[in-house]
Amino acid sequence: MARFPEAEARIFKKYVCLRCGATNPWGAKKCRKCGYKRLRPKAKEPRGGGR
């Protein structure tokens, strides 16, 4: 995680398209690349564990 809130907001305040994986701005209603309407917020916790 980021060390201060400004950096955390810059890194994590984004949406990710569920169809194509493109990153989109926080206020987006649909994907900028493919137009898909289902977006998820970018994950704040790592997934794999680094093994």
From Swiss-Prot:
<dbReference type="InterPro" id="IPR001975">
    <property type="entry name" value="Ribosomal_eL40_dom"/>
</dbReference>
<dbReference type="InterPro" id="IPR023657">
    <property type="entry name" value="Ribosomal_eL40_arc"/>
</dbReference>
<comment type="subunit">
    <text>Part of the 50S ribosomal subunit.</text>
</comment>
<keyword id="KW-0687">Ribonucleoprotein</keyword>
<protein>
    <recommendedName>
        <fullName>Large ribosomal subunit protein eL40</fullName>
    </recommendedName>
</protein>
<keyword id="KW-0689">Ribosomal protein</keyword>
<dbReference type="InterPro" id="IPR011332">
    <property type="entry name" value="Ribosomal_zn-bd"/>
</dbReference>
<dbReference type="GO" id="GO:1990904">
    <property type="term" value="C:ribonucleoprotein complex"/>
</dbReference>
<comment type="similarity">
    <text>Belongs to the eukaryotic ribosomal protein eL40 family.</text>
</comment>
<dbReference type="GO" id="GO:0005840">
    <property type="term" value="C:ribosome"/>
</dbReference>
<dbReference type="GO" id="GO:0003735">
    <property type="term" value="F:structural constituent of ribosome"/>
</dbReference>
<dbReference type="GO" id="GO:0006412">
    <property type="term" value="P:translation"/>
</dbReference>
<dbReference type="InterPro" id="IPR038587">
    <property type="entry name" value="Ribosomal_eL40_sf"/>
</dbReference>
